[in-house]
């Protein structure tokens, strides 16, 4: 491939500096095109905004689910508090009646209040059950966000793979041995760490970058 010559820039010449940067940029683009990596890098770059949008979606869905759950809890709390308060009051009145039996008229009032409380309980519990169901339904975001997060991880791994490919295809001669040792990176990490020479994928990446001086 014919590469454009890069002329030394005069120290004070902005035009020469711009020309040099332009030549370097053109040389890089031509090299990527010759290696067949220009499209892969472009696809990886396009995936970054998509991943950001997906992450925003996960945040929004999580926030909506949290808000629904909190609203349901806040709506249920008064019903639970009312039942608790009334139950304690009735229990105290019945305990006092057993300790010191009261007049028939007072006893009738106690029975009437107790019956009213029992009639009100199903309404409170029905409302609370509906709120609990809404809390449970709010958790369905996990299925959707789980799929989105998995897709984002695939995108991140693909970007890393493409960047590693560029490095491995363009490292200098003195780095040939580290290149051979790290060629397995392009096939993804090996899970069986019990095998000799196998390390975690991130460690492999770090070793490669260290060997290249990054």
UniProtKB/Swiss-Prot annotation:
Instruction: Specify whether tRNA-binding is a keyword of the entry.
Output: no
Where in or outside the cell it occurs: the entry states: Cytoplasm
* EC numbers on record: 3.1.3.-
Gene Ontology terms, MF aspect: phosphoprotein phosphatase activity
Its chief place of residence is cytoplasm
In the UniProt annotation, what is the result of changing residue 166 to G?
A: Enhanced activity
Biological process according to GO? archaeal or bacterial-type flagellum-dependent cell motility; chemotaxis; regulation of chemotaxis
What highest taxon heads this organism's lineage? Bacteria
| Chain positions covered by the region annotation Disordered | 176-199
Q: How the protein is affected by changing residue 143 to E?
A: Loss of function
* Residues annotated as site: Enhances dephosphorylation of CheY-P: 147
- What effect does gene inactivation have here? Cells lacking this gene display a strong clockwise motor bias; in combination with a yhjH disruption and overexpression of ycgR, cells switch from clockwise to a counterclockwise bias.
| One annotated Gene Ontology cellular component of this protein | cytoplasm
UniProt biased composition (Polar residues) = 184-193
Q: Which Pfam families match?
A: CheZ
- Keyword list, A-Z: Chemotaxis, Cytoplasm, Flagellar rotation, Hydrolase, Protein phosphatase
Q: What does this protein do?
A: Plays an important role in bacterial chemotaxis signal transduction pathway by accelerating the dephosphorylation of phosphorylated CheY (CheY-P). Acts on free CheY-P.
Give the family per the record. Belongs to the CheZ family.
- How is the quaternary structure described? Homodimer. Interacts (via C-terminus) with phosphorylated CheY (CheY-P).
Q: What is this protein called?
A: Protein phosphatase CheZ
Natural source organism: Salmonella typhimurium (strain LT2 / SGSC1412 / ATCC 700720)
């Amino acid at each position: 491939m014919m590469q454009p010559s890069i002329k030394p820039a005069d120290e004070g010449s902005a035009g020469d500096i711009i020309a040099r940067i332009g030549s370097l940029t053109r040389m890089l683009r031509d090299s990527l095109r010759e290696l067949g990596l220009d499209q892969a890098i472009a696809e990886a770059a396009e995936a970054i905004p998509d991943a950001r949008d997906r992450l925003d979606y996960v945040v929004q869905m999580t926030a909506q689910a949290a808000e629904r759950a909190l609203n349901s809890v806040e709506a249920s709390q008064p019903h639970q508090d009312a039942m608790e308060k009334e139950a304690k009051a009735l229990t105290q009145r019945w305990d006092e009646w057993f300790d010191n039996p009261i007049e028939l008229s007072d006893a009738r009032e106690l029975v009437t209040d107790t019956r009213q409380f029992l009639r009100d309980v199903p309404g409170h519990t029905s409302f609370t059950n509906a709120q609990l169901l809404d809390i449970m339904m709010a958790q369905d975001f996990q299925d959707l966000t789980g799929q989105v997060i998995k897709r984002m991880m695939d995108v991140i791994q693909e970007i890393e793979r493409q960047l590693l490919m560029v490095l491995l295809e363009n490292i200098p001669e003195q780095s040939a041995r580290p290149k051979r040792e790290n060629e397995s990176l392009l096939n993804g990490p090996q899970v069986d760490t019990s095998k000799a020479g196998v390390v975690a994928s991130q460690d492999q990446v770090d070793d490669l970058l260290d060997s290249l001086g990054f």
